[in-house]
Amino acid sequence: MSIFRRRGRDEREPAEAPSAADTSEPTGDSGGTDKDPRSSGPYDSSEIDLEQSRADRIDLGGLLIRRVEGLQLQLQVDEKSGRPAGVMVVLDDAAVQMIPVAAPRSSGLWDQTRLQIAADAQRLGGTAEEAAGPFGTEVRIVLPVTTPEGKKAVQPSRVAGIDGPRWMLRTTFLGAAVTSPEAFGRLVQVVRDTVVVRGDSPMPPGELIALRPPQKPEAPEA
C-alpha cells in the first residue's frame, strides 16, 4: 500500500518548458483560507489520541502520516548531515514535500520564512507571488531548470507553511498538485491528516524535527 525509499532532497523531475499556448503558473486552488487554517489539521500530538494515531498512520517519528491507497513515501536525507530532512509524499503524478521544524513558543515562523523563500526564488531567476490557499498565505513559485537531457524547463510549486505549537510544517506541492485542483485537494487532505510529534526537548527555531524510517510491524507471538 505504501512504498518507502530514501532519496535526496527535491528529487522531483521538472516539467518541460511549455509552449506559448501553455501556462507555467500554478492553478488556483481548492479553497481559500479559514480564520484558523489549522482547525482541520495538521495536528499537534497533544491534540489527538497519540496511540490511536500511530495505529492509523505511518510512523516517521516526528510525523505521523495517514495511510492512503496508492500513497508512496520517499524519505529525503540531508547530504551534509546524513539525517532525514523531510519526506516526499507521492500520489500518482502529484507530490507534496513535508519538512517539520521547531519554532518559538511565542510566535510562528511562516511569516518570515515565506519572505526568504520568495527572495531565493527570485535570486535563481524564477518568480514568486503570494496568494491565499487552504493553509493561509502561500507562495507560488516558478523556477527555470534544466532537465538531465539538457532541455530548458520550468518547475512550478506551491509552498505553504503551517504554524503549530512550537513547530512549523513546511509543505511544497509539486507535479500534478500544482496544475490539477483535484490532485491538489487529495494531498491537502493528506497534510491535514498528518500529526506532528515535536517532543518536549528544547530546540532552536528552524531546527529539523527528527524523522526516521517507519518501523517494521512486530511479528505476532506464536
What would you call each of these model-derived segments?
Residues 156-161:
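Hydrophobic/aromatic beta-strand elements that line small-molecule binding cavities or substrate pockets
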Residues 7-45:
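N-terminal intrinsically disordered, low-complexity tails
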Residues 4, 32-60, 66-68, 72-155, ...:
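Conserved polar/disulfide-associated segments of primarily extracytoplasmic proteins
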